[in-house]
């Protein structure tokens, strides 16, 4: 499946626009990552634990969006946008949302 931030796919004709599809992931940040991030914040540097969590959440949100597009008969998602939100009383939750327009594009048989 082609997934792109562009409003079209160069060289491909969009045959049908299906609907907007979403993939959402909410993940908690664990205590040990918080301690490590706090120390890195104090001393400077990057928090690999938080970065890994962010990457995993983003990839899962995109996979979920792709799955929902496939479920409605789409073979591509265009205009993809990814949003991040920190949630919870102590900002201990991360929400990642991927959204885009599910479409059917022409398939060329060679």
UniProtKB/Swiss-Prot annotation:
It comes from the Bacteria. InterPro entries: UPF0145_dom_sf, UPF0145_YbjQ-like. Pfam families: YbjQ_1. Gene3D superfamilies: Hypothetical protein apc22750. Chain B (3.30.110.70). Belongs to the UPF0145 family. This is UPF0145 protein lwe0170. It comes from Listeria welshimeri serovar 6b (strain ATCC 35897 / DSM 20650 / CCUG 15529 / CIP 8149 / NCTC 11857 / SLCC 5334 / V8).
């Amino acid at each position: 499946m082609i997934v792109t931030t562009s409003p079209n796919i160069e060289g491909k004709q969009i045959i049908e626009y299906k609907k907007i599809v979403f993939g959402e992931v909410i993940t908690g940040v664990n205590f040990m990552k918080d301690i490590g991030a706090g120390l890195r914040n104090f001393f400077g540097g990057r928090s690999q634990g938080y970065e890994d969590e962010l990457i995993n959440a983003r990839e899962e949100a995109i996979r979920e969006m792709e799955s929902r597009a496939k479920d409605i008969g789409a073979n591509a998602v265009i205009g993809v946008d990814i949003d991040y939100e920190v949630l919870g009383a102590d900002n201990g939750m991360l929400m990642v949302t991927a959204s885009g327009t599910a479409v059917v594009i022409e398939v060329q048989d060679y």
